[in-house]
Structure formats: C-alpha cells, structure tokens
Regions:
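A domain-start/cap signature at the N-terminus of enzymes
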Residues: 16-46, 316, 320, 326
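Primarily recognizes the serine-hydrolase "nucleophile elbow" in alpha/beta-hydrolase
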Residues: 125-202
Length: 326
C-alpha cells in the first residue's frame, strides 16, 4: 500500500460553533479492488485518541480528487469520525488532464455512475472487513455509524446509494450500511421524467442537502437542461418528511461546496471561474458548513442529543441564508 503523510494548514480545530475547519494530518493511500482490477487513490483521516468512532466516506465531483472535501474533512475528524476521501478513476482530475472538458462530459455517462457506486461499496466493504478483523486502528470503527457525502457528481453518487429512483431501474445501487447522508450541490433528474417525490421519496435515512444562491451548472445544460440553485434545493421537497434538511447559503457558488477540491481545474476551465466577492466569502461559508455538517453527523450517526438540539436552529446563518428541516 502506497502511503505518504501530509501536514495540513493550522487553524481553529473543532466542529463546534465558531470554529473554522482545518486540514489535519492525513494519509494518502491506494486501495485496490482486485475483483474489478481498479485502484482508488484515498485520503484517510483518523480522529485522535482510542475511542470508538464513526466513519464518513466522501465522493468528489467531476474532475476532482481525494483532495475533495478537505475544507471539512479535518472538522469531521475533530468531531470524532474516521474520514475517507475517495478518488474515482474515469471521472477524476486525471480524466480532465487527459481529455479536458470533453472527457468530463463523457464521465457523466451511466457506466461511470455505476463505477462510482461500486467504489463506494468497495470502500465500505473494506471498512467492514478491517473492523471485523480488528486490524490496528480499524478496531475503533463503529459499523453502525457509517455515513456518506459527496459534491456535485459525488452528490449524484450519494443520492444513488441513498435510494434515489431512476426512470430505468438501477438494481444494486442502494447501500444499506450507510445511516446518514450529506449531498453538496445535489441535483434532480435533468429531464424531469419522474416527479421529485418519485425520485427521492424512497430515501428513508437522514439526508442533508446543501446548496447556495450561485450554485449553478458547470456543464452548462448538459442534456438540454441547466441546473440552477433552485433546482438543487428542490431535492429537499422530494425527500420524505421527518429526516430531511436543507442548508442554503447566500453568495455561495458551486466551487464553494467542493471544499477546496478542483482548484487546478478552476484555473483552466471557464465555468469554474469565480467573482472575487464569492471567493472572499468562502472562508466564512466553509466554517459554517463544517460546523453544521459536523453536528449533522454527530446527531444522526452517534446519537448526540446536543448536536441534534443545535440543528433545530443553527446559529451563524446570514440574513440571506436558509435552514429547513423536519
């Protein structure tokens, strides 16, 4: 197994109110799924101490990498979770380097979503196997406290394993071992072939959708339909009442929710270029997202009553921000 240790930027450490996410020491590894002859670059963060911990598996967006979600990966680690950032070959930064915009458009084909879902299942299989074998730190992992998150195409991946329905049946997508989900920049079906309730009504576990007023469509209307902030927010309306939430951030764009991910693409690809005022607000947005998502995981994976109480009316929201939950 290939491994190199990284030292992240130093900042305020925790997930509690007022904290700023930081990138903590992490290990970059390569995990190979022999059954598919597929090697996944991984970034792995362990929480300090010896206590039992939950696990969160994060999926990057199109053209991203295991660096996706770094902005909150450290905060989730500080909240008591093992955090695993998965890189998906075929829809990652290497695909963009090899083929540019055309390769990323091709990466939205169904076979890449199938591969991504299988990647997530393989990672959870590995978590389970290592935990049951009680291999070193893996003996700490609570198999009843696994969550999944993703940004953009990673959110599409998370929607699939959470139970989203498709016009064509997609057997084997649902991952029952995940107990809660966070989708950054989620999206409904572009063609609207199913109603929102038909698409998302079967998701029966806690699901947090996160978007913002500038969260547009980097692919600019692939398939003839352009996704906008309101369509991303509409995912909430399709989810069953009782275990759903929506965080809307005023002035946050699509790249805000990548969590420092696709910076290298942003410098080369027009749709990712940002207004200076959006970038200036990003640190505050990242801090708020890190805190609220940390509380979400603690409430729904660890049964933390204080975190659940904080989510009833999260502090720190601006006048243009919105929080909905029921």
């Amino acid at each position: 197994m290939q491994r190199r240790h990284l030292l992240g930027a130093v900042g305020a450490a925790a997930w509690w109110p007022g904290a700023i996410a930081r990138v903590l020491p992490a290990a970059d590894e390569s995990w190979t799924d022999a059954a598919r002859d597929r090697t996944l670059p991984m970034r792995v963060r362990w929480p300090d101490g010896e206590d039992a911990c939950g696990a969160i598996v994060h999926s990057h967006g199109l053209g991203g990498s295991r660096e996706g979600g770094d902005a909150w990966g450290g905060a989730w680690r500080d909240a008591g979770f093992l955090v695993l950032h998965v890189q998906h070959p075929g829809s990652d930064i290497q695909a963009f380097r090899d083929g540019g915009m055309g390769a990323l458009r091709e990466a939205t084909r169904p076979e890449q979503l199938v591969a991504r879902v299988a990647d997530m299942r393989f990672v959870i299989d590995e978590i389970e196997r290592r935990a049951r074998e009680r291999r070193g730190l893996w003996s700490r992992v609570r198999l009843d406290a696994i969550g999944a998150s993703g940004h953009s195409y990673g959110a599409v991946t998370v929607q699939a394993i959470a139970g989203k329905r498709y016009p064509v049946p997609a057997p084997g997508f649902v991952e029952p071992r995940c107990r809660a989900f966070v989708a950054f920049s989620p999206s409904p079906d572009r063609q609207g072939r199913l109603s929102l309730a038909q698409q998302f009504g079967a998701i029966d576990r806690p699901f947090l959708a996160i978007t913002g007023s500038l969260d547009g469509d980097p692919l600019r209307g692939r398939g003839g339909v352009e996704l906008g902030p309101e369509s991303r927010a509409s995912v909430y309306d399709g989810l069953p009442a009782g275990q759903r939430a929506l965080l809307w951030l005023d002035g946050a764009d699509h790249m805000t929710f990548g969590g420092n991910a696709e910076r290298r693409i942003a410098a080369r690809w027009g749709p990712f270029k940002r207004a200076p005022e959006v970038a200036a607000r990003e640190p505050g947005h990242h801090a708020l997202v890190a805190r609220i998502t940390g509380q979400w995981w603690r409430a729904h994976l660890l049964g933390d009553a204080a975190a659940a109480a904080a989510l009833r009316s999260p502090p720190g929201l601006g006048s243009g921000d919105r929080w909905r939950s029921d």
